[in-house]
Amino acid sequence: MPESMSFSLNQLNLQLLIPMCISLFGGIILLGVGVFNKTKSRDLYITISMLFVVLNLGFLFLEGNPIRQFGFFNLLLVDGISLLTQIIMLLATFVLLLFFMNQNNLPETQGAEFYALLLFSIAGFAFMASSQNLILILLGLETASLCLYALIALHNQKSAFEASIKYFIMGALATTFYAFGAMLLYAATGSVDIISIATFLHQQSYQPSILVFAGFVFLLCALGFKVTLVPFHSWGPDVYEGSNALLAAFIAIVPKIVTFAVIIRIFSVFIDSHSAFVEYTLYVIVVLTMTIPNLIALTQKDVKRMLAYSSISHSGFVLAAVLINTPQSHSVIFFYWFLFLFANIGAFGILWLSVDCKKNYQTQISHPFEKFSGMIKTNPTLAILLTLFMFALAGIPPFCVFWGKMYLMQSAISANYTILALIMAINSIIAGFYYLKLVIYIFAKEPYEIKDSQSSLELSSKFALSITAFVSVACLFMVQNLLEIIEKYILK
């Protein structure tokens, strides 16, 4: 064999592809079962999905090594950031699947294709989080995004179809921006490999050319669309509103943590240049993303839209940790999002459990504040849990998100971003108003409907609510240990 064609299998390091292959294989199995299973047993599909999610998690915990590993001719990079991203993504998916098992007759959740697409999207996101090549990141992003477009539109209702089209158009625009940004960086540095780009800029004494700055701007716009940074956020609330509550929770958590992992890899290169343009641009976007959605959320009349704007604001907090760009702040990103996912899924899960399947689709996906009026009288258990999740999302001590915000502000102050820490504190106070608005409806208003609206909960939903509530409250006792585990992954 010619020398140029010879290579070692060690260069492939194919075991790095196992997490993606597990999800892909699970999706294919689901499609096969769906073809031959005439009874359309949703519980079977969910059980198979959970089996592959648990198998994936088990592999990451047992075989995952936070020390950097390269594979597939150095196109793949599996390190602590990649492993943490996949673990958070899979934990969120597992809890959401528990909620999906509750008896709910929305048509889109009955077929095998729904859960197959969910696993395919996880495979795409895992590929995206485990790459250091701008082109392969785009490949993983598009694979996952196409699955999400289909998942949203699967119900074939007007509002769902409209949400899917908006998401698709914004996604196509983001892809265009990303491709153009990658092209500019290639023109400036001769590489689409993130490490090679960083090496080139270091050799140039971090004096980026206009092409590098332009590439940064286009990539910021593209990734900003994916994590709903202001001013690229307008699609978010409409897509959340047109999706069922659990799918909205998935979109609010999984694509964002994966994209933030990519943002850490790419933007750390630009931030290390100590360019005033890069720092001021990110600073302005951080402040706008934390503040504007908070103010808009105050005026919302639908709980799902309020949670959508809340999620956008939380993205601003996480981007602040990227801007700070220290090992401590990078650890806080995953610490914050881990705590946020349980409170957020818990809140969206209760919206899911409050659906009345006998009503029309628009009523099913709409959750006006009035719907929760007097909930403490009609369903005290869910009312107390929803209140707990609102306190957690508001960052009220000692609930989970409080610790994420506290450590984030501490990181900001340590890195001399004192004003930024003050802005975070002000926005946390503003957020408290719209979260507590729902609590007032739950406790101080008369029931919206006279009839008893007690929900019949499956054991799986009770388990999911128990997990989310437990983490939201008991994190007080595991904060330090959790942060130490995350830091071990990040620092290696």
Curated annotation (Swiss-Prot):
Q: What class of enzyme is it?
A: translocase
Q: Any keyword Iron? A: no
Q: What superkingdom heads the lineage?
A: Bacteria
Looking up InterPro entries in the UniProt record yields: NADH-Q_OxRdtase_suN/2, ND/Mrp_TM
Where is it located? Cell inner membrane
Q: Kindly report the protein's main subcellular placement as a broad class.
A: membrane
Instruction: Enumerate the Gene Ontology biological process terms.
Output: ATP synthesis coupled electron transport
**Keyword field contains Transmembrane helix:** yes
Q: How is this protein situated with respect to the membrane? A: Multi-pass membrane protein
Name the chemical reaction catalysed here: a quinone + NADH + 5 H(+)(in) = a quinol + NAD(+) + 4 H(+)(out)
A GO molecular function held by the record: NADH:ubiquinone reductase (non-electrogenic) activity
- GO CC terms in record: plasma membrane
Q: What is its EC number?
A: 7.1.1.-
Q: Where are the transmembrane segments?
A: 16-36, 44-64, 81-101, 111-131, 134-154, 168-188, 210-230, 244-264, 276-296, 306-326, 332-352, 382-402, 423-443, 463-483
Q: Which UniProt keywords apply?
A: Cell inner membrane, Cell membrane, Membrane, NAD, Quinone, Translocase, Transmembrane, Transmembrane helix, Transport, Ubiquinone
What is known about what this protein does? NDH-1 shuttles electrons from NADH, via FMN and iron-sulfur (Fe-S) centers, to quinones in the respiratory chain. The immediate electron acceptor for the enzyme in this species is believed to be ubiquinone. Couples the redox reaction to proton translocation (for every two electrons transferred, four hydrogen ions are translocated across the cytoplasmic membrane), and thus conserves the redox energy in a proton gradient.
Family, per entry? Belongs to the complex I subunit 2 family.
Q: How does it assemble?
A: NDH-1 is composed of 14 different subunits. Subunits NuoA, H, J, K, L, M, N constitute the membrane sector of the complex.
Which PANTHER family did the record assign? NADH DEHYDROGENASE
Task: Supply the name of the protein.
Answer: NADH-quinone oxidoreductase subunit N
Q: Which organism is it from?
A: Helicobacter hepaticus (strain ATCC 51449 / 3B1)
